[in-house]
C-alpha cells in the first residue's frame, strides 16, 4: 500500500511538471519554434508522471486514487493542449 507521504510527494512532483509544462506551453504559444527542446522536455515530464502514476495507483487506497485521478485529468489535459498547439 502506498503511504500518504509517498502520494503527497508524487503529487508535488506532478504539480511541478504541470507548472513547467504550462510555462513552456505559454512560451511556445508566443515564440513558436525557439525553445523546442524545453517544450519537448516538459512533454516528457508529463508522460513520465502519467506512467509513474499507473504504478502508484495500483497500490493506493480509495482516497489516494481519487487524488491521483484528479491529477491525472490535469496532466492529460495539459498533454492534449501541448499536442494540439501548432508548434
Q: PLM features: residue spans?
A:
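N-terminal acidic leader/helix
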Residues: 2-35, 72, 82
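Short, structured coil/loop segments at alpha-helix boundaries
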Residues: 4, 61-65
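Short, charged, amphipathic alpha-helical segments
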Residues: 8, 36-47, 65-73
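Short E/K-rich amphipathic alpha-helical oligomerization segments
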Residues: 22-59
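Amphipathic alpha-helical coiled-coil segments
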Residues: 48-62, 77-87
Amino acid at each position: 500500500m502506498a503511504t500518504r507521504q509517498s502520494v503527497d510527494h508524487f503529487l508535488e512532483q506532478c504539480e511541478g511538471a504541470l507548472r513547467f509544462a504550462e510555462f513552456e506551453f505559454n512560451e511556445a504559444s508566443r515564440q513558436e519554434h525557439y525553445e523546442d527542446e524545453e517544450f519537448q522536455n516538459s512533454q516528457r515530464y508529463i508522460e513520465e508522471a502519467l506512467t509513474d502514476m499507473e504504478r502508484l495507483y495500483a497500490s493506493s487506497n480509495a482516497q489516494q486514487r481519487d487524488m491521483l485521478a484528479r491529477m491525472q485529468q490535469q496532466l492529460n489535459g495539459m498533454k492534449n493542449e501541448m499536442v494540439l498547439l501548432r508548434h
